[in-house]
Amino acid sequence: EEMLFWTLGFIGQKFYDRFQFAQWGIHLWFYGLPSTGKSAILQFIGDMYDSMDVGILPDNCQADFGLEGMHKSFVILAQELTEKFNLPQALLQQIATDYYLSINRKFDKRENVNFRASFGIASNIVLKYQDNNGSMIRRMLVVHFKNPWPVSKTLNQEAFREITQLIRGRMYLRTCLAYRIMCNYVGKRPIW
């Protein structure tokens, strides 16, 4: 029950400016078996925004230019990551903790940007990063998905029909409320 509360809170965090109420510097990572709903939850988060405000980080993103153009997004979602995912570890760590980043741009100068986007990850595998002295695990809230759901070919259509109800309904309010309660509980202190 406590893990569900924290998970809802970190989903709710995606609907606010990343450092508006807390400076935790933590990514939400859904990890586990296939067909457990990891990507569906990230899709739910993405559907809450205008499509222009969502950055999609593909599994085969370029290591040097993977974040080019994403700094204007409100949320960045990386679904179905595999061992081919090659965003540098240092950059992934900086996304979590630094408000300003220097982003490589193809055929242009690096750009120092105010990086405000929240980040959500879903994968079936442990990513290939090294956890030197806890440098990665303290920047991730890992939610382990263990129980597969029956596959539905119309799941996206069903979810799209219900998303309007969810926006007005309990899930959106619950996630935002859980996040605000977390902020009041932890405050600006480091979460770990």
Regions flagged by a language model, labelled:
Residues 64-72, 103-122:
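AAA+/SF3 P-loop NTPase mechanochemical coupling elements
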Residues 113-116, 132-192:
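Phosphate-sensing "switch" segment of ASCE/P-loop ATPases
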Residues 1-72, 141-144, 184-191:
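P-loop NTPase catalytic core of nucleic-acid-dependent motor ATPases
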Residues 52-53, 72-74, 99, 115-118, ...:
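Short glycine-/polar-rich loops that comprise or flank the Walker A/P-loop
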Residues 80-82, 105-107, 116-126, 145-148:
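A short beta-strand-to-loop transition that corresponds to the Sensor-1 phosphate-sensing loop
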Residues 50, 89-111:
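Conserved catalytic/switch belt of AAA+ P-loop NTPases
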Residues 37-39, 84-87, 127-132, 149-154:
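Switch/connector loops and helix/strand junctions flanking conserved nucleotide-binding motifs
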